Amino acid sequence: RQGKVDVASILDAAVKKNGQKLDWKHSIVDLLKALDLDSSLTARKELASELGYTGDTSDSATMNIWLHKAVIKKLSENGGKVPAELLD
């Protein structure tokens, strides 16, 4: 089995390439942009649903916090080395 992928360095490089100031460690919108994924509210609601979010999607602030944690957790579960402070 190969070593874990360093998610932080890949995302930092993606942010640099993107040219925008993206705070992927704290913002789901910025994380999705760094991954070159749709970061619209509709897309985030769909992603939250796919990942098992059971809260109110009209409360986007709460959903975004949950979604950020869920995406980071998925990256970690799928072989990504994620900074420890980003995991619960």
Question: Which residue ranges define each predicted feature?
Answer:
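Amphipathic alpha-helical interaction segments
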Residues: 1-88
